C-alpha cells in the first residue's frame, strides 16, 4: 500500500506539472485513461477475459462516477496546493459513512453515534483545513475536490456490488478507463482541442499515465491480498507524500492549522471506514441469524408434518 501511495503522490505531482505547462484537465483525463485502456485491454486479451457483461448498467454508473471522480481530482490538483487537493480527494470514506447513516435511518435501525461523530469530525477537519489556506477564487476548486470524494464513494459502492456479481476486476477497470477516455476526448474537443505539449508537458503526461496505472495496480494488490484495515489506514500516506512533495517542488504553503485539519480528516476517514465495516458485519450477522432461525423453523415444521 505504501508503494501505491508513492505512485499516486507522484501522479499528483505530474498532473500539477502538466497543468502548469498548459495541458487542460480534460486532456489529462484522456491521456491517463487511454493509457490505462491499452494496458488493461491487453491484459484482458492475454487472460482471455471478454468485455461482454450482463451488468452493463452497473458498469456504466460505476464508470461515469469513477471518471467524474478522476476529473474532479485532476481539476482540484491543478488549482489547489497538491496536499490540500489530495486530502479532499480522499474524503470518500466520510461520504460512504453518510450513506451508511442514511440507510440505517431509512431502515429504522437508529443512528450509529460513533460513526456520526466521526463524520462530523471529518467535515469539521475540511473546514479547518481550508479556512485559513485558500482564497475566495479557490472555493470552486475546493468544492470540486470534495465532489471527487463523493463520486469516489458512489463508484466504490458499485465496485463492491459488481464484485458480488463475480465481475472480474480487469473488466471493471476496463470500462472505467473506456468511459474516462471517451469523456476526456469529448471534453477536450469541446474546449478547444488538444494542446501541442512541450517537452516538460510530454514527460509529465508520460509520468502521470504510468504512475496512475502502477498506483492502481499496487492498490488492487494491497486490498485484495493484504489486511483491509491496515491497507485502508496506509492509503492515507499518499496525503503525507503529496504534501511533502508539493512543498518541496512547488513551494506550496501549508499552515499548521491546515495540517491540523488534514490530521482530523485522516483520523475521521480511518475511523469512518472502521465503523462502516462494523455496521456491514453486524448486518451480515443479523441476516445470517435470521436465515438460520428460518431454517430451524422449517425443519421443526417438517418434523411435525411427518
Description of each model-found segment:
Residues 1, 54-64, 110-123, 141-146, ...:
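Cytoplasmic-side transmembrane-helix entry/capping segments in multi-pass membrane proteins
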Residues 99, 111-131, 257-276:
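Hydrophobic transmembrane alpha-helices of multi-pass small-molecule transport proteins
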Residues 16, 40, 133-192, 284-306:
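Transmembrane alpha-helical segments that form core, pore/gating elements
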Residues 85-91, 167-179, 216-248:
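Helix-helix packing/entry segments at the starts of transmembrane helices
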Residues 1-4, 48-74, 140-148, 188, ...:
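Loop-to-transmembrane-helix transition segments
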Residues 21-68, 96-99, 151-155, 174-191:
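Transmembrane alpha-helices of multi-pass small-molecule transport proteins
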Residues 75-78, 92-116, 240-259:
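C-terminal transmembrane-helix exit sites in multi-pass transporters
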Residues 107, 236-306:
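C-terminal-most transmembrane helix of multi-pass membrane proteins
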Amino acid at each position: 500500500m505504501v508503494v501505491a501511495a508513492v505512485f499516486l503522490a507522484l501522479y499528483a505531482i505530474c498532473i500539477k506539472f502538466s497543468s502548469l505547462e498548459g495541458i487542460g484537465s480534460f486532456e489529462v483525463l484522456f491521456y491517463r485513461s487511454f493509457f490505462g485502456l491499452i494496458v488493461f485491454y491487453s491484459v484482458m486479451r492475454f487472460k482471455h477475459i471478454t468485455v461482454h457483461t450482463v451488468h452493463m448498467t452497473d458498469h456504466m454508473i460505476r464508470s461515469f462516477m469513477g471518471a467524474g471522480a478522476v476529473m474532479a481530482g485532476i481539476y482540484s490538483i491543478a488549482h489547489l496546493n497538491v496536499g490540500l487537493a489530495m486530502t479532499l480527494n480522499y474524503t470518500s470514506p466520510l461520504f460512504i459513512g453518510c450513506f451508511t447513516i442514511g440507510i440505517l435511518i431509512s431502515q429504522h435501525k437508529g443512528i450509529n453515534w460513533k460513526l456520526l461523530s466521526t463524520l462530523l469530525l471529518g467535515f469539521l477537519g475540511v473546514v479547518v483545513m481550508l479556512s485559513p489556506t485558500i482564497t475566495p477564487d479557490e472555493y470552486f476548486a475546493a468544492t470540486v475536490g470534495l465532489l471527487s470524494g463523493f463520486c469516489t464513494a458512489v463508484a466504490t459502492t458499485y465496485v463492491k456490488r459488481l464484485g458480488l456479481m463475480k465481475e472480474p476486476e480487469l473488466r471493471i477497470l476496463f470500462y472505467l478507463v473506456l468511459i474516462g477516455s471517451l469523456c476526456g476526448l469529448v471534453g477536450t474537443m469541446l474546449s478547444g482541442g488538444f494542446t501541442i505539449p512541450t517537452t516538460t508537458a510530454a514527460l509529465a503526461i508520460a509520468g502521470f499515465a504510468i504512475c496512475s496505472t502502477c498506483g492502481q495496480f499496487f492498490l488492487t494488490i494491497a486490498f485484495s491480498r493484504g489486511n483491509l484495515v491496515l491497507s485502508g489506514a496506509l492509503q492515507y500516506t499518499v496525503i503525507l507524500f503529496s504534501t511533502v512533495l508539493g512543498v518541496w517542488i512547488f513551494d506550496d504553503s501549508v499552515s499548521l492549522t491546515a495540517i491540523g485539519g488534514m490530521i482530523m480528516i485522516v483520523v475521521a476517514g480511518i475511523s469512518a471506514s472502521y465503523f462502516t465495516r462494523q455496521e456491514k458485519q453486524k448486518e451480515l450477522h443479523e441476516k445470517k441469524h435470521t436465515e438460520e432461525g428460518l431454517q430451524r423453523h422449517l425443519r421443526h415444521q417438517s418434523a411435525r408434518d411427518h
